[in-house]
């Protein structure tokens, strides 16, 4: 509305963004099967960052803005779809590491931090808009428009890159390792059952 002076663009953005998100969500099972959760998650982050950075530098008209935004929304579809899919993996990893299956604690912690992030997402933009001098329903200054573009594109892009780097370097739970972890957990459970059966037979 303020950057491109095209109020009708909002309706087109809603249509195309939902379409790209829907296509991305439908492709998640196939891409995960072919490449694994981690790689698909990273690819989604990269697409998100690329779409935002392209929009910041070259999204100067309605067509390029929608096109680059679709790239970003397509990437977020993979990221948002896999957020919940990665949680059960951490539950199994925790059980393998500690011997305790803390499923309730993991999901509770994840839900808690999602609520914290949602609260911050509603609180921080208001402060940042005030800092750049944004006043709704009036013509914005060049400095304010530049600040809006940074808020919309640069900050999300930077956070997506940080998340991708963190995931790439510190998250080592790929499909091959996860399969070995599940196998070891099952072996432990089988041994526990055998031990219990032997103990019961001796008692009898």
Region annotations inferred by a language model:
Residues 1-204:
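Membrane-embedded alpha-helical bundles of multi-pass transporters/translocases
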């Amino acid at each position: 509305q303020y950057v491109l002076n095209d109020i009708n663009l909002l309706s087109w953005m809603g249509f195309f963004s939902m379409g790209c998100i829907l296509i991305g969500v439908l492709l998640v099972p196939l891409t995960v099967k072919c490449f694994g959760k981690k790689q698909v998650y990273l690819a989604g982050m990269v697409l998100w960052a690329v779409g935002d950075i392209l929009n910041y530098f070259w999204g100067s008209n309605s067509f390029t803005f929608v096109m680059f935004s679709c790239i970003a929304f397509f990437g977020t579809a993979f990221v948002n779809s896999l957020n919940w899919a990665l949680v059960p993996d951490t539950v199994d990893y925790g059980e393998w590491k500690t011997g305790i299956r803390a499923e309730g604690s993991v999901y509770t912690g994840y839900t808690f931090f999602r609520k914290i992030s949602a609260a911050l997402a509603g609180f921080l933009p208001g402060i940042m808009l005030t800092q750049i001098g944004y006043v709704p329903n009036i013509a914005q200054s060049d400095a304010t428009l530049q600040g809006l573009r940074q808020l919309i594109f640069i900050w999300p892009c930077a956070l997506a890159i940080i998340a991708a780097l963190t995931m790439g370097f510190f998250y080592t739970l790929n499909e091959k390792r996860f399969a070995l972890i599940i196998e070891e957990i099952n072996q432990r459970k089988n041994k526990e059952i055998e031990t219990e059966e032997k103990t019961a037979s001796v008692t009898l």
